[in-house]
Amino acid sequence: PDRLSIAVKEQQPVAYWGEKAFLNPRARVFEPEPSVDLPALPRFEGPDGYEQRVLLVYRQLQDMLKPLHLSVDSLRLDARRTWRVRLSNDLTVEIGRGNPVDRIARFVRVYPAILAAGSGQMVSVDLRYSNGFAVRRQQVDTHAESTG
C-alpha cells in the first residue's frame, strides 16, 4: 500500500467517434483531454458496440475508393442499421441497410460513367435500390447574363 502504480498508454486516433470521442486503430473509443489539438480525421457515428464494424467498413471503403481519388470524410451507421457516407468531394452516398461494401462496389464500377454523363456536380447518390441507384446533381445555370 505504500506504492502507487500508474500506467500511461498513448492513444492514436484514426477517427472521431460521435461528438467528443475518438476511435483508435483497434476500434476502442477514448476521450481526449480538453487541451488536445483536434486533428483532421474522418468522423464516424454508430450505435454502441458497433465501433469495430464501422472501422472495418471504413477501411474497406477507403481501399475501394482510392482508385477514384476519393476518400471517406464521414461514415454513419444509425440505430436502424442504415449506412450513410460523405466523400472527400462532398458527395453524400445513401447506402441503406445490407452490405455496404457490395453497394459501394456497384457505385465504384459506374462512377466514371456517371461523371461523364451529366452536367452539374453530383450532390448525392442513393444506393438503396436493388436494381440501380439515383443521382442528384446540382443545377447548372445555363442562362448567361447579358451586358449591354
Please annotate each region the language model reported.
Residues 1-148:
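Charged, solvent-exposed interaction patches on well-folded alpha/beta domains
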